[in-house]
Amino acid sequence: MTDKLYLDADRLLNDSFRLADQVYRSGFEPTFIMALWRGGAPIGLAVQEYFAYREIETDHILVRTSYYHGIDNQSREVQIYGLNYLVKNLQAEDRVLIVDDVYDTGRTIISIIESMQDRLKLNMPQQVRVAVP
């Protein structure tokens, strides 16, 4: 079993701003920020606020995923809720930043991107990046 690291609110906020700064300094300027509910929500908020401070306009949305059924039990398929707004508004030239609190197996992110590709077709943005602190 791995040890868990628990962050207080100040550390999470500071780490979130550092993450946003790394994305900004990489030259990537998202037009959409997708934060994953629940853990990614406060991080996504800080990232969006950072870009607003830099006068970079971004649209932002929370997307919920689920595949856990009780402690240590996972279903095979990731359920994704809240992509409809993105399907209606994204264009191929958009730049999407997916923000979450942890990157474990990559299953959730892969499922989201595959679902976006399936639903958006030719409107699927060519530039999709993932950011976690």
Predicted regions, residues:
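PRPP-associated nucleotide enzymes
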Residues: 1-133
